[in-house]
Amino acid sequence: MKPIKNTITYSICLSMSLLSQTFAQETTVLDEIKVSTENSNYSTQNDNYYKTKSQSATKTDTPIRETPQSVQVVSNEIIKELNAVKIEDVLDYTSGVSRQNNFAGMWDNFSIRGFAGNENTGMSLLKNGFADNRGFNAPRDTANIESIEFLKGPSGSLYGNSEPGGTINIVTKQPKFTSEHSIKTDVGSYDFYRMALDSTAPINDNLAYRLNVATEKKGSFRDDIESQRYVVAPSLLYSINDDTFVSYMGEFIEQKAPFDRGIALIDGKNVMNPKNFLGNPDDGDVTLKNQTHQLKLEHYFSDSWSSRMGVAYKNNSLKGFGSEVTPSTKITTDNINLRTRYRDYSSDDIQFQADLQNVTDIKDATNTLLFGVETYRFEQDSILYTNKDTVRVDNIRSNPTYTVLKTGLGSLSTDKYEEQKGVALFVQDEVAYKDFRFLTGLRYDEVRMDNVNHLDSSSVKQNDYAVSPRVGITYLIDDMWSVYTTSGTSFRPNTGTDIDGKTFEPEKSVSIETGLKFESEDKKTGGTLSLYQIQKKNVLMTDPNDPDEKRAAGKVRSKGIEFDFNGKITDNIKANFNYTYTDAKVVEDSTYEGNELLNIPKHTSSVLLMWEDSLSLNSSYGIGTGITYVGRKAGNVNNDFYLPDYTTAKIVSYYKVNKELNFSLNIDNLFDKEYIASSYDRSWLTVGNPRTATLSMTYKF
């Protein structure tokens, strides 16, 4: 086996050589690309409620109906309809997605089909096809999001290091060669204030820009919680000629918020007042800063050949104090001592991608061949100070009071450096023959990890290798209906060490799925019914001997049924409906066998209905309702308590005065239902938001 450094260097040189040789060939002008760039990442066709294509499902132009995989796309229209400002605001309206431990509100963390990934990195998440979940990321803001793609099932043959339940790909807004500008303001309950700018225009005939800016300040129904958020996202699109495009996407996010683990169980059954803050108000804010840069080159050599190349860089940091109940603490009285931790985490992530695509017609068949290379290097420094019994909270059931017992950083409990290097080669072949669509894919991954513990000057090295195949078949029954079946594998390196300092084996999984798809002839509505089963081994779970440590479970299994439908049913009615049944549990383990996976309800469902009508030539209105149901779910890995089911409702409405001015009013949790959204264990319960109202105004110019 060649050293990974040499493999990375060779792969990059090979890709550069292939591209440079092909650039020298005579190219064919593709007029349709010049008009809409529909086959590239820069399509401006973003106004559809229902999406017929996904950028990331196959990395090709294959329609969703012909893809042997369940794919749901939340369009920008749905994002605006829900007045979503973070991606968690839309996840209730997609099947198979459940909330997980969000690290005291510091990041996004959700599971798909029962699998949440590493809790120190969160779910499998991409941004424009680049990995976006390594390091500590602030909750993603929708200010520069065009759509959110949910790729169900394993994506290991294309994306390698991913979860078998599915992957989320965020598609950011792209520059346009038309002038469009808007300012949006939001005012809402609990001192919520937000302003966002979206501006795009051509700089000249070949260069266009887009700038998204957002600033947000909000309070909370919970005591002593206020937060701020700032987003700046510039992007550029340069059309070198009709065949060649260069794009840049930048994103700068800063979030300041208190470290809030939520509430806790008292006597194992009574929940605290959801307004009470179980922390130290004097800790101040935890500050997260993320900056992302992506540069892509896309070239069409001819009608048959095209290629993409890209590089991405991301820097993350998290700093601040946070006081919390020690996990798994059993609270039996009205007072509790907290521990205080100071965290100083920083990371750098650089990635390179290149692929080459060929489309060939052979008699009755069309063959689409894709092959490429990916490399990355990720580094993270983690410093953690722990000070025990620093704050005593009294009267936690009613009116908490806080007494500081100790100050200072405490002892240095973690000081480590982690480095990951990865390289991958992948190939995918799609064959369209009459009414059949065949897909095969294969990816080879090589990952090297170095973990250095500065506390005892020890280091642990780990090398992982994986081959991830995928096969799938789709049969087009007629112009609207299709059936598919697919199977694939995925792998994900487990970072860190166990309580004895030993590294973990990588997670490996096998998945099988079959389904039925529908798409109306006018392409305005569509739906998917899917059945799946996934088995996965070496999943990290809480060590029963130390809640701050992890151990690898033997094997877990998830199986279920999902149904999604959305689109514009009539000229006046739009609908989004989904239902999920998930049976996810540990099937082999010395401690947890038979237990349900954390925060995974067996049943979830949601519906969003919207009525729209015109009032005059340029004036219109819309009003609708959304209802979500989340079933009972395990509150910790031991399954010794469960979170009850809940149903919430919301009202969405807007009034479009004219082409320039629009007002909207959204009311969430209409009936003010109290519920627990997720938990980590009995001492960390995340409280759902009560009834809130938000009034928004958008002005286009």
Language-model features and meaning:
Residues L237-N241, S347, T366-L370, E374-F378, ...:
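Structural signature of Gram-negative outer-membrane beta-barrels, strongest in the C-terminal barrel
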